[in-house]
Amino acid sequence: MPQTFDTWIKSDRAQQFDLIRLKMIKKAYDANLDWTILTNPKYNIKQMHEIWITMLYNNNPRPLCNPKLTDQQMRILRKGIEEGFDMSPYNDPNIEQTQLFEIFSNLMKNKKEN
């Protein structure tokens, strides 16, 4: 049986989160978004925010769901997703931020040319 928000918030897992992160998870729940994506305690606040924003705009946040990504990598991936690109192949934390930005820039350049 899937866990409800009410049972999760009372669980030991929820106790791992500070108030700011709990509020973000609650906002996702209140917006009928998949709040369970945000319950990975390895995400920092900025990473959670990038995932939450992606979900808020009805985009698939799965390419961002790697806690080893930096905040900046997540932000670039989110921008790519918002532009309609499949960013799944680029969610490798070993891709440097500058290289990831170059990939995003090239995708945007190709989009404008077509």
Predicted regions and their residues:
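General marker for long, soluble alpha-helical cores
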Residues: 1-114
